[in-house]
Amino acid sequence: MRKLIASTFASLDGIMQAPGGPEEDPVGGFAFGGWAFAYWDECMDTSASGFDGKDRELVLGRRTYEIFEAYWPYQPADSPIAKTLNAAKKHVASRTLTALGWNNSTLLQGDVVSAVTALKTQSGLDLQVIGSGNLMQTLQAASLIDEYNVWTFPVVLGRGKRLFGETAKPLALRLIRSQVSTTGVVMSTYV
């Protein structure tokens, strides 16, 4: 059975909404988009393998898919992350999209929990959810996530979409890897 790995950025108080920019996810009046960039350093560039989809198939929510699809295909061809994400097979959970324009992308059919459960039973590369907060919470509530890559940034946002929301089940996780960037970002992997 394939593993499902969830990878996300989170603030110290567990907010994962819009780390990349102010326009990324302003839902609910969230005004702090782009909070992660002030903390980026070279250590994080070399540790980005937990987020780059390398040797994995991606499982993305609609919003994350649309953000990635509008950005990564247009990055320089020599960018290792762009090259990997553009080549990766992408499974997209959406109730509204009917067609996908990014290469190697397919829509998950039917109920997302059933669709991801079926993907996990197929042979192939491990599966990775990147960002995709609503999708991640749905998959966590269904006990489908096997591993968490969480980069915790030393910032408190106070409000926004949380990594573990109201539907979260209690979890006892074990830390298997941890590294700290020069800016205080804690890059952790839990199973």
Regions found by a protein language model. Give the residues of each.
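Portal/gating segments that form or line small-molecule/metal binding sites
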Residues: M1-L144, P154-V191
